[in-house]
């Protein structure tokens, strides 16, 4: 902590924040973070917080992992930023090689690096359009892809992400996506799949012709949309449809990647090989880095100079990402993800017996969520209750986030390095919030 930071109180920092920082930037917790380690954060007043938010899925290897810190320190001492477009450097190339090696599929792959998740999605769209010579972009209802103009256009939730920011990019369409908890009463999952798949097919008759579509962009598990998990059958149908019609199938793995669901990429659970994968968040343990990985012929459709950016694929970010990949392997975080998810799931089902407002429990690996409803029969979303639970947690030492179109989903994005004892301590705080 710097001397300046220590000499100013939390209240004074909060006043400065309100005076000098745009109110358009939200803060889920008004404390001042000064130190993070593993799955714990400490504020300016010395209070400890157990982290179930993970910087919105950015910290799968935890806060300030020693190997990440050492890699970044070493890199900063040697080279901070020559600009890859000016002079290339080894870490960028090494990271591209490693990611191409772990990405699904035996085909030849290439990668590019950028700064943010939204940039990765934008560049996936650019690549798909260049490769197919088509314009149309299809995303899905309840999907979230970023806050730039193109990615806002692809995003489903109007407030707070899109309201008043138009006009939006043309030739962007949103296809139906399954939501099994909210399916029609009495309908089986199989029948519901039939219905949604038919609606997906009809979408390409009523809304946009497939031969005009460059890419379909899908989150294998919808993040901001509420941790909605599609069936293997639905995902495979979408991938097959894309292949049949020459459409680039893009897996948006920005929140789901790097062991969050128990595999490097969530799309692996669905036995589908995407054409392109977008990555960011936990890729570099909190440093700004994103990328697009995919079929070599697609990445090479762009001519030199058509992709990239001033800070894209910085040496510091690439060094951190290489350390992250080592940590995932050395510490078995894919396996640990499933263990964490099971602990959360088991506890959530205990709660469900006691609290009727817990409507649904769902997870893939450690990407877990509980849906808060007003009535288990009507399944009406209860945003107010979910917000109160999250507020209680944040006031009592647990960083916790909500999600979903209706804001009624409690989501778990804890670092995968969390111990069982710390995880259970955090769950105890959450349980107190459920009772409050």
Curated annotation (Swiss-Prot):
Listed CDD domains: OAT_like (cd00610)
Biological or metabolic pathway of the protein: Amino-acid degradation; 4-aminobutanoate degradation
Biological process terms in GO annotation: gamma-aminobutyric acid catabolic process
Catalytic reactions on record: 4-aminobutanoate + 2-oxoglutarate = succinate semialdehyde + L-glutamate; (S)-3-amino-2-methylpropanoate + 2-oxoglutarate = 2-methyl-3-oxopropanoate + L-glutamate
Residues bearing PTM N6-(pyridoxal phosphate)lysine: 281
A GO cellular component entry from the record: cytosol
GO molecular function: (S)-3-amino-2-methylpropionate transaminase activity; 4-aminobutyrate:2-oxoglutarate transaminase activity; pyridoxal phosphate binding
Keyword Transferase appears in the UniProt entry: yes
InterPro entries named among the record's database cross-references: 4NH2But_aminotransferase_bac, Aminotrans_3, Aminotrans_3_PPA_site, Class-III_PLP-dep_AT, PyrdxlP-dep_Trfase, PyrdxlP-dep_Trfase_major, PyrdxlP-dep_Trfase_small
Pfam families given in the database record: Aminotran_3
Listed EC numbers: 2.6.1.19, 2.6.1.22
Main EC class the enzyme belongs to: transferase
Keyword Transferase: yes
Gene3D superfamilies per record: Aspartate Aminotransferase, domain 1 (3.90.1150.10), Type I PLP-dependent aspartate aminotransferase-like (Major domain) (3.40.640.10)
Key words, A-Z: Aminotransferase, Pyridoxal phosphate, Transferase
Cofactor: pyridoxal 5'-phosphate
PANTHER family reported in the protein's UniProt record: AMINOTRANSFERASE CLASS III, LEUCINE_METHIONINE RACEMASE
Family, as annotated: Belongs to the class-III pyridoxal-phosphate-dependent aminotransferase family.
Protein name, UniProt field: Probable 4-aminobutyrate aminotransferase
Lineage: Bacteria, Bacillati, Bacillota, Bacilli, Bacillales
